[in-house]
Amino acid sequence: MTTFDIELYVSPGDGSAGGDGSSERPLAGLEAARDELRARRTPGQSAVVHVAAGHYRLETPLTFEPSDSATTYLADGHDVRVEGGLVLRYWTEVPVGDAVLWAADAPADRHIRSLFVDGERRARTRRPREGLFRVAHQDGLDLMRGSHETQYQGSDTFGFTPGDIEAYDALRDVEVVVPHYWIQERLPIAEVDLATSTVRCARRSVFALRDDISGSFANYYLENVREALGEVAGEWYYDRAAHRVLYVPRPGERRETFTATVPVLDELLLVHGEEDRPVTDLHFEGFTFAYTDWSLQRRTLSDSPGRLSDEIAYGSAPQAATDVTGALEFRHTTDSSLVNCVVEHVGGHAVSLEAGSSRIAVTHNTLRDLGGGGIAVTGGASEATGLSRDNVLTDNEIVTGGRVFPAAVGILVRHSAGNTISHNHIHDLHYSGISCGWTWGYRDGVARDNVIEYNHIHDIGHGTMSDMGGVYLLGVQPGTVVRRNLIHGIQCANYGGWCVYLDEGSSHIVVEENVCFDASTQCLHQHYGRENTIRNNVFAFGARGLIAVTRAEEHVSFTLERNVLVSAGVPAIVGGTGAAHPYDVRLISDLNLFWDTRADTAMSGEGRVDATAPDEVLTPLSDDAWRAQGHDRHSVIGDVGLVLPGPDRAGGPSVSRERAAEIGFVMPDLTGVGPRSRPGKQ
């Protein structure tokens, strides 16, 4: 049992300004406990703060600095809530057209962007009610040119189909929302010219206003339209001029009994050390952190692959919502932890580990209803600045993410080494489950020796974004291993619904003993990279093949051996339209087991590998010709008897032992996949 030099007690109801921190006279609030420790303890003393059940509402973020080190904040109860929300009261009825709305005053010093009713996130008004509008034209954008050739031709102005956009009241509060490529742009309207059907926005899009590879202009919708209020129950609108929230009640809701909460903070917890004096040994256990809002920030471009300007306000970060803040933020913090907590109803990421964050354990938490992603780790791009490493991100449930920023990732690790990312359950997101690395191409970087294992990642994408992976890797990462993960249900928009994605420059990575299935394009894709090892995996039922290759290079791109590859009417290893031909890619492939459950098995094929033409047939290539290239000369074609797990993970995975023995394949043991019970917990 750990002993502490100082022991304090906090209570929201029994505490008072005159409390001394004893169990009989607890302090009132977490800030009071922090300040009492600053005044009382001498250097080197450790402390524990027992926090009684109740609601602790913050008016400003709770901040910690180096002098607050060596402290454990322990929730003594099942419902210790730290909240940044304000409950709106005194609702009145307001008739609007044929509808009766409810109205309540909101804080005048906030631009309210989020509303939660009885603990559920409510949507702002939007147009159209169903589906999406489409950009009519963007000056200077030639759709006949390739999507990547024109990718960075962003704009703040575009033409629309007459009637799609109107001269709305509070026009500058209306936002154009554009999901395309792998991001979602958010562009507040500046002005509308109805005579020319042209709209100009206050921000510029990062990418050209096209629907990436589909050959069409981008889709979009409008959000926060006052004129749409009253059309759908449960929607709401913030009248910024009157500082009022207008809400359309759902059937059965009563003003006297429902609870509506608006966040008044963007962050709840800020743990900020200094580069030469970090916060150390600071721990939080058993809390629920809830209610933060989001804002349109100045977009940072530090991780952009180029062609963007720091002088322009853009509608999105270039990838993965990297500019979004965390409700709980750690910077220059070491040897600390967040354990057995809940983070919910937040506008950005749940947890951010920023520069100089090392040896932090984020374990056994539930992160849900997130505007952004679950955990975002960001270190310095070189070992000399802001190095972050050796963090433990395990046993977390990360669910319902990307509700504001759909390009956010379940667990994002940038410029960081030696991290353990394991036993997490990540699902119901719109973009990648886990993303790691973050140096484009073959440039030097600090990412290495990251272990990604025993994660259950499923039901992500939802057809919203393109170019995603259940596990996404970027850049040279020696020592990084992706193993024993269960990944399935990856659904992209136009292209790139992959279970494992080795993007630009991914090199010296081992992908082994994973079970990957049900991908809207392929189970594995290597854009380009060097000397990766893909072994002893199950890849099954990619809609457009099982493994996609994109770029031919002079070196060996990857080694593919002792894998089970099961398709349903499509070739296994594919390339072609818009990508390299499989014969042109230098790879080592052998001792694999191939089977097609619907058609003659084809080891390789060519054709369109994206999802824009699902009925277009991929052309099988001759197995003899494939083998003549030196590939799969000892591989086997035959029914593997594959059984995949059902929705409750029962009934699999398994393969025929006899078939597996022919190639030396050993079925991955995934019995421990997903979060484990905490020691001492049931």
Locations of regions flagged by a protein language model:
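Beta-propeller domains
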Residues: S205-G215, N224, P251-R277, A290-T292, ...
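Short glycine/acidic-rich loop motifs that flank beta-strands on beta-rich extracellular proteins
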Residues: T60-P61, D266, D293-R299, T325, ...
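Repetitive beta-strand solenoid architecture
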Residues: F4, Q45, A52, L58, ...
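Predominantly extracellular beta-rich ligand-binding scaffolds that present long acidic/polar faces
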Residues: E59-T72, G77, H508-G651
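Right-handed parallel beta-helix
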Residues: T280-Y291, Y314, T334-G348, S357-G372, ...
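Extracellular beta-strand solenoid repeats
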Residues: H50, R57, T63, L74, ...
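Asp-box/WD-like beta-propeller blade repeats and closely related beta-sheet repeat scaffolds
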Residues: G380-A381
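Extracellular polysaccharide-degrading/modifying enzymes targeting complex plant/algal/animal polysaccharides
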Residues: F4-D5, Y9-H332, S337, D623, ...
